[in-house]
Amino acid sequence: MSRVANNRDWADDEDLEDSNELPQSTTTTNKDGTQTIVTWRFNDDGKKVKTTRRIRFTKVKEIVNPRVAERKSWGKFGLSQKDAAGPASDTTSVGENIIFRPSTNWRKDAKEEVSDAGAMKNKLKDKQVKCRICSGEHFTAKCPFKGTMAPLGEEGAVDVAAGHADTPEGPGGLGAGKSSYVPPHLRNGGAAGGERMGGGKFERDDLATLRVTNVSEMAEEQELRDMFERFGRVTRVFLAKDRETGLAKGFAFISFQERSDAAKACEKMDGYGFKHLILRVEFAKKAT
């Protein structure tokens, strides 16, 4: 029996050893500074798989503020003296970790943003600011006549001479011909402005503004002032002009200090010929 045991095939032990154990991992340092690491593992079929990896180590030198590096080397003190290195959850609040996801089409996205901005610029190139009250080239909020006349084309404007609208109000302050909601402050005469303290100066300015239409495009403000000052003191002259050409747009507003002077000018200047055109003069309507 001992002779049979001593005459076993040498491959039997090799197969037995290979089927149960994996060779040890080896790490070899090469002359170029890289390392070759050989590892073994079993795959899903129970076979040995050899993995060889070659690793190159690179040192990255980072330049930081010396003061920052010095603070990082400070030791903990006080109640946290025995704590481990790094931030502790009970004494340090760590900011949210923001995950950065780089985009592969960032150049395309940037071009689209530039093209969109260019298209919007071209779209707004021909747009001009136009006042809804006097059609001048300024914002409606900055119109010098926003308190003395109604927007052009509106039918519900309050006549200056009458002082109130002709449309009667129904029960509850709603319009008789409308079923839309009317805010409380506009019901039962709430829209009418209260009397101003100090006086008549502002009221005279509101009631003594004339609207002059069919004005020649070659007209100037000083010419209009000279014509209307014959009837009384003129406090303000506004002639709407085109911003690009500088020519008049065909209408103007003349404000007198006294309403009687404005009425006299309206009577005399309505139908007056000026630069081959017949002027149309009327009282400006007050905004509601």
UniProtKB/Swiss-Prot annotation:
Keywords annotated in UniProt: Cytoplasm, Initiation factor, Protein biosynthesis, RNA-binding
Output the CDD domains linked to this UniProt entry. Answer: eIF3G, RRM_eIF3G_like
Pfam families for the chain: eIF3g (PF12353), RRM_1 (PF00076)
Polar residues bias located where?
21-33
Alphabetical list of InterPro entries matching this protein: eIF3_g, eIF3g_N, eIF3G_RRM, Nucleotide-bd_a/b_plait_sf, RBD_domain_sf, RRM_dom
| Biological processes annotated in GO | formation of cytoplasmic translation initiation complex
Against PANTHER family, the record matches this protein to:
EUKARYOTIC TRANSLATION INITIATION FACTOR 3 SUBUNIT G
The job of this chain, per UniProt, is described as: RNA-binding component of the eukaryotic translation initiation factor 3 (eIF-3) complex, which is involved in protein synthesis of a specialized repertoire of mRNAs and, together with other initiation factors, stimulates binding of mRNA and methionyl-tRNAi to the 40S ribosome. The eIF-3 complex specifically targets and initiates translation of a subset of mRNAs involved in cell proliferation. This subunit can bind 18S rRNA.
Query: What protein name does the entry list?
Result: Eukaryotic translation initiation factor 3 subunit G
Q: What is the lineage of its organism?
A: Eukaryota, Fungi, Dikarya, Ascomycota, Pezizomycotina
